[in-house]
Each structure stands twice: as C-alpha cells, then as structure tokens.
Amino acid sequence: MGISKRAWQVAGAAAGGASLFGGGLAIGRLLRLDSQRGDYRKAWEDHNLATLDRLRECDENPEGERPYLIVSLGDSSVQGMGASRITESYPARLASAINAQLDREVLLLNLSLSGATIESVELTQIPQMRGLGLLDGPYSPDLVTLTIGGNDVMTEDM
C-alpha cells in the first residue's frame, strides 16, 4: 500500500514550513551579527584607547612593573562576533585567564577587524602595531594572537 497524495502534501508543507522557519532563524542571526559588528568595533576602540592610556601612565612611572601586554590580530572571530559581549571573546577570556595566573597587571589591545583577511592584517593591523610603537618600542607585546583565514577562503583567489 502506497502513501496517499494527502500524506505527501502534508509532509511537503511541513518540510517547507521547517525550511522557512530555519531560514528565518538564520536571517535573524545574521542581522544580529551585523548589528554587533559596529557595536563591538566601537567597544574595542574604547577598550584600546583605555589600554593605551594605561600604557602611557606606566611610561610616566618607569619604576613600576610593566604590565603583561597581549595584542590580538585577526577577523570577526577575534572581535567576538556571536558572543554575548566583548568580554566573552576569546582574547578577553585569554587575558582574564593569564591575569588569574600572573602576579602582575595584564593589558589587552585588540586590533582585529571584522572581515579581515591575511592581506588586510599584513597591510593594516601589523602597521598599526608599528605605529603604536609595539614592534620596536618599550611596549613590545608579551603575546600576540592571530586568528585569520575564514574570510580568505571565501574569496575567488582561493
């Protein structure tokens, strides 16, 4: 005995509804991520400015112990896209974990940019480090993290 035409129609409608529902969820998630992009970029800029101010304070008081400095380079995964807030990004969590182990201040500069590629890290983020005096100045980082490549595999050159 075969499956009735009505059963096929119901199954098809259910599958179509599930597809539309799933597609709607995916679109909603993409829109949330898109709105995060600007918010997170601004939050990291504010964080970075505060970190640079703290480094300047340390410069003015050279007797104190130099903070442990982490610089993070990369793309949206480094920005924390998808996390509930920037403190849940992996660089912030890494800085927090290192801070828990060290008996000194830990500072984080996150120079990442959503949409970054290998080329853009090379042409913008590394020169930004140089411009801030982080490659050859008194505040060379103790740790540099790099997460890149997701956007590169999406290009036609790959």
Predicted regions and their residues:
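N-terminal secretory targeting modules
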Residues: M1-V71, G80
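Conserved SGNH/GDSL esterase-like catalytic core that processes O-acyl groups on lipids
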Residues: Q79-M158
